[in-house]
Amino acid sequence: MRLSFLGLKRNPKLVKSILFHGSDPEIVAFYIKEYLSFSSTEPCAEEIPAAHVKSDPEGFITKLSMPSLFSNQVPILIKGATDSLTKTLSDPLSKIPEGQLVLLESSYLRATSSLRKLFESESFLGALTCFELDRPYVIDKIQSFNLN
């Protein structure tokens, strides 16, 4: 589903994975950092390069299905996501276990992007275009769709 900081269209608790994309990498990173600080007990995420997910999709699926040794799952952040990941991710994202959060970081994706379309069309996925760096506004809106 398309997420915005102007409000959610559906129940945010259904969202298992969020695609953060925008033209300014610093703004995208800021949104992710702020989101993690409010939505997760873990203030940081385990970063995985998109190229690694593409080259070893089975390893990524295994990582998603492994229970955490700790009480809370550490969010997974896929950095540098592009349309080339769409087919690789479509099935594993539908099988994300309860409590696991998968975030994707990408440069700006056009409305015709297959990855963006995937995240906007599925009810358990969300896409967020990061274009405004206004900290109080961002924090307020992130708090309004806290996944926990």
State where each predicted segment sits.
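Conserved beta/loop motifs at nucleotide-recognition and modification sites
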Residues: M1-N148
